[in-house]
Structures are given as structure tokens and as C-alpha cells.
């Protein structure tokens, strides 16, 4: 080794040592703020029981939304329960019924100010009872949980928002600005219910300072190396694409098969896509903010890694896609082949076969760019792409804005043991529709939930803790009452 090369290597080693030392110092400096206060308000045992019974009554109504159907019978039954349980809301708030989608307004003292809106959805996904411990629409209260479809997603949100407003109105509360409640009937099937509410605001020339929907929640161990509660506030939703990829051929009898049949070409395409995962990996500003926010609540090795994106960013881009699908979703467009079709008989080669791919475009590689990547591989196998639906990621809420800061403040006051941080959502909510009339769309469900409860939301044995439900009512009440 020549003296020049040795000097270069020595200099590089010195730079690396300095960089690691700076990273270690930064990791030591990153600390979660001390928060030893008690929650701002607690429900009494009587209130806690009442809240559980109200949610149970709502869960017992099977408001399952179905594509191509517009039967509001069960939704009207649910709304009758809500009128009974939240009398002050329906007596004092101005109700606009948009084909079952409810929009309620409590007028504020200053009619010139923009309002705030709390939202959720009345509909639930189907539940056939298979693998359920109890009837999915029993609303059973047992072992300090409310059991049933919609208990977590998201009748708990609707119940807590309406209950909070009902109590505030009963206490004579007069808000400084208009306060709205919006609840749709077809969120689970991406229906147009919430768009009717958005159209209402557009027609009247109204804007909102803040819109808050379901989304992130309060989870323990949300990320590896994070042994505490974290309140994840969804500030951005990834995009959504459904695309049908078709292969055409001459068909024929399976006894004399040609090469490269439609199914063979589709199989090769799917295999290559699964093997290469060809979408761009990047740490976007939103994900960077999420990691830096999470770092303060993590063990030292993870704090050093996520608290120093400037140094470890390239390493994270390699590691995260390999850690888990959950981690990969933060840094890349994800895709999954979900449907397929071909011949109608076992001995017939189809003249056309297809697969459907669902993609969730990242904010750094939008729907158009993600489709270009997919089409590049489809062209290789002489496949046609038919885009069924495509939309980009939502806008990102202003992380330095007053509304995000206020929500974090309320989380600190009501859940002092949970650190609040911005969160990138892989799934979708109705909230994105309100971007047309609101600059600060936040997605947060103030519910402490376990990983098991999170996994059960569209599966069997959906539950919510009774104490956690009560705490969420008090959160919404605190949030609305103290909004200036």
C-alpha cells in the first residue's frame, strides 16, 4: 500500500470516527420531554359504564356497506340510537342529512372564523361470524371490553365525538368558531358519502381550520426498539391504484399447449415484480419527521439510527424494506397482486387471462410514476394495463402549523404517558376529501390499543377497551373545549 492510499484511508477513518461520535452525541441529546402530569380529565365509573353501553348499542346495528347497494335501513336504525343517546347534539346542532351521511353544525361566536370538524363513519366491513368468539354484532361487554364489528373501526370514534359534544352542549358550551360533526355511510367501500359533505362546504364558500378523522392511534411498541406508548398522528396518506394487467393469446386445448400462454406470461411478470420490488426507496420529509420524532422514545441503538438520518439514511433505505412489509411501506410504493382470472375450464387454454394489482404510491413516487414502473415490466411480457382507479398521496398536514401543535398539546395533556409524533398512513380515510376546504387534515383516533386489537379491526374478534373508550370521550371534550 502506497503512502497516498494509506493517507486517504486514514483520513476516511478519521471522518468516520468523527461522524459516529457526532451521531452518538446527537443520540444522547435526543430525549423525550419529561411529562409527569395526570391526565386532564378522567371519566367516573358511572360515565365509563354509560359510554360502554352506548357503544354496545351502536355495535348491535349491522351497518355493513355493500358496493352497488344503497339500503339505508340499518343506518337509520343506528341514527335513531344516536338521537336517543345524544339528545343535546340533535336538539342544538344544525343537522344536514345528505342521504344518510350526517353533517351537524354548532354555530360559533364568530361567524367569520373558519370552523373545525370531527369525523368518522357509520359503516363497517362484513363479519360472517367465522372464527369469532361471540356474535360479531352482539355488542357484548365482557372483561372490560366492548366486543363486536365496528367497536374499533370506527363506531368508537363516532360515539366518542358525539358524546363529547353532547356533554359540552349540556354544560352550556359556546365555541369560538363553528364546530362540525360529519359521519358517512360508505367509507369502507370508498363511496361518495363524504364528498357530499365536502360539496356542502364548497357551495357555501366555507373553509375549515382543522379536520380530524380516524387514522393513527395510541400504540405500545409501534416501532422496534420503542418500548413506550406512542400517539401516531396521521399527517399524510399514501396514494391508491388498482390496475388490471391482461395477457392475450390464441387460446386452444390444453393437450397441445403452445409456449408463453397468457397465464405463463402473467406468472413470469408477477414473479419478476415480486423478486425485484422495483419501486424507488426514499426517506421522504414526512417519514424523516416521523423517525426523528420517534427517536426520542426509543432505546439507544435505535435512537442513534433514527435520530441521525443525515448519516444512516442510506443504511435505512437498504434495511427497512427487508425488515417487514410494515417498514417497507414507509419508504416505497408497495404493491400486491390480489385478484386473477382466466379459463372457465381445466382443459382450456384461455385466450385472455388477467391479474389485478393494488399499489399504494409513496409521496416521492406518485401514481403516474409508479404506473410507469409497473408498465415497464408489463411491456416486457406483452401485457396490457387497464387502470381502474389511481390517485396520488394526499397532501401533508403542516407539521409546523398551529393545528398540529395544538393536537400534540392535547395529547400531552390527556395522555401524558404517550409521545405524539407524525405518522405516514398506508391506508386511506375519508379525511383526504376535505383537503379541498381544509389545510390541516389530521388523522388520529385517541384510543390506546394493543397490536392484537389493531390486527382484529377488519378480522375476527374486534374489541375496544372500556377504560380506553372513556378516555377518548374525555379527549375529544378537552380538544373541542380548549380550541381557541
Language-model regions: role of each:
Residues 134, 176, 207, 228, ...:
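Short, solvent-exposed loop/turn segments at the edges of secondary structure
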Residues 95, 99, 105, 111-113, ...:
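An extended, acidic, His-containing surface patch that forms the Zn2+-binding/catalytic region
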Residues 146, 152-232:
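Acidic/histidine-rich catalytic neighborhood of metal-dependent amide-processing enzymes
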Residues 122-123, 273-278, 375-383:
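A common structural junction motif
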Residues 196, 200, 255-278:
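A short core secondary-structure module
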Residues 9-149, 171-175:
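Acidic/His- and Gly-rich active-site-bordering loop/insert found
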Residues 236, 257-259, 328, 345-350:
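Short, solvent-exposed beta-strand/turn "edge" segments of beta-rich domains on protein surfaces
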Residues 260, 370-378:
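Short amphipathic alpha-helices in soluble, non-transmembrane regions
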Amino acid at each position: 500500500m502506497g503512502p497516498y492510499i494509506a493517507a486517504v484511508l486514514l483520513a476516511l477513518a478519521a471522518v468516520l470516527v468523527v461522524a459516529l461520535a457526532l451521531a452518538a452525541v446527537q443520540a444522547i441529546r435526543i430525549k423525550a420531554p419529561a411529562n409527569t402530569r395526570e391526565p386532564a380529565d378522567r371519566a367516573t365509573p358511572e360515565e365509563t359504564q354509560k359510554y360502554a353501553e352506548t357503544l354496545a348499542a351502536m355495535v348491535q346495528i349491522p351497518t355493513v356497506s355493500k358496493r352497488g347497494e344503497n339500503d339505508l335501513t340499518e343506518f337509520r336504525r343506528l341514527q335513531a340510537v344516536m338521537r336517543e343517546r345524544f339528545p343535546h347534539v340533535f336538539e342544538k346542532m344544525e343537522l344536514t342529512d345528505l342521504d344518510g351521511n350526517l353533517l351537524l353544525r354548532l354555530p360559533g361566536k364568530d361567524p367569520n372564523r373558519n370552523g373545525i370538524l370531527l369525523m368518522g363513519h357509520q359503516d363497517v366491513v362484513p363479519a360472517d361470524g367465522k372464527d369469532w368468539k361471540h356474535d360479531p354484532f352482539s355488542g357484548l361487554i365482557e372483561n372490560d371490553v366492548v366486543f363486536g364489528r365496528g367497536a374499533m373501526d370506527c363506531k368508537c370514534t363516532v360515539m366518542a365525538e358525539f358524546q363529547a359534544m353532547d356533554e359540552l352542549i349540556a354544560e352550556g358550551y359556546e365555541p369560538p368558531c363553528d364546530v362540525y360533526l360529519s359521519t358517512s355511510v360508505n367509507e369502507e367501500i370508498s363511496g361518495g358519502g363524504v364528498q357530499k359533505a365536502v360539496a356542502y362546504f364548497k357551495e357555501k364558500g366555507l373553509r375549515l381550520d382543522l379536520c380530524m378523522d380516524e387514522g393513527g392511534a395510541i400504540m405500545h411498541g409501534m416501532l422496534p426498539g420503542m418500548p413506550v406508548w406512542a400517539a401516531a398522528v396521521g399527517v399524510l396518506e399514501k396514494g391508491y391504484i388498482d390496475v388490471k394487467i391482461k395477457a392475450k393469446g390464441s387460446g386452444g386445448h390444453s393437450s397441445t399447449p403452445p409456449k408463453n400462454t397468457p397465464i405463463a406470461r402473467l406468472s413470469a411478470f408477477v414473479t419478476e415484480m415480486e423478486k425485484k420490488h422495483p419501486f424507488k426507496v426514499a426517506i421522504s420529509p414526512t417519514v424523516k419527521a416521523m423517525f426523528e420524532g420517534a427517536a426520542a422514545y426509543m432505546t439507544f441503538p435505535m435512537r442513534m439510527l433514527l435520530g441521525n438520518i443525515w448519516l444512516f439514511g442510506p443504511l435505512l433505505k437498504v434495511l427497512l424494506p427487508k425488515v417487514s412489509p410494515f417498514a417497507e411501506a414507509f419508504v416505497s410504493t408497495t404493491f400486491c397482486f390480489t385478484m386473477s382470472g382466466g379459463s372457465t375450464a381445466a382443459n382450456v387454454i384461455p385466450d385472455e387471462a388477467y391479474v389485478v394489482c393494488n399499489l399504494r404510491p409513496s409521496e416521492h413516487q406518485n401514481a403516474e410514476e409508479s404506473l410507469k414502473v409497473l408498465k415497464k415490466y408489463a411491456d416486457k411480457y406483452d401485457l396490457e394495463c387497464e387502470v381502474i382507479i389511481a390517485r396520488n398521496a394526499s397532501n401533508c398536514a403542516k407539521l409546523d402549523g398551529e393545528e398540529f401543535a395544538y393536537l400534540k398539546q392535547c395529547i400531552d395533556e390527556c395522555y401524558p404517558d404517550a409521545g405524539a409524533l407524525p405518522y405516514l398512513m398506508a391506508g386511506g380515510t375519508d379525511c383526504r376529501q376535505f383537503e379541498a376546504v381544509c389545510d390541516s387534515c389530521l388523522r388520529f383516533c385517541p384510543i390506546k390499543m394493543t397490536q392484537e386489537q389493531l390486527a382484529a379491526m377488519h378480522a375476527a374478534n374486534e374489541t375496544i377497551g372500556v377504560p380506553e373508550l372513556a378516555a377518548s370521550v374525555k379527549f375529544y371534550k378537552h380538544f373541542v373545549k380548549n380550541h381557541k
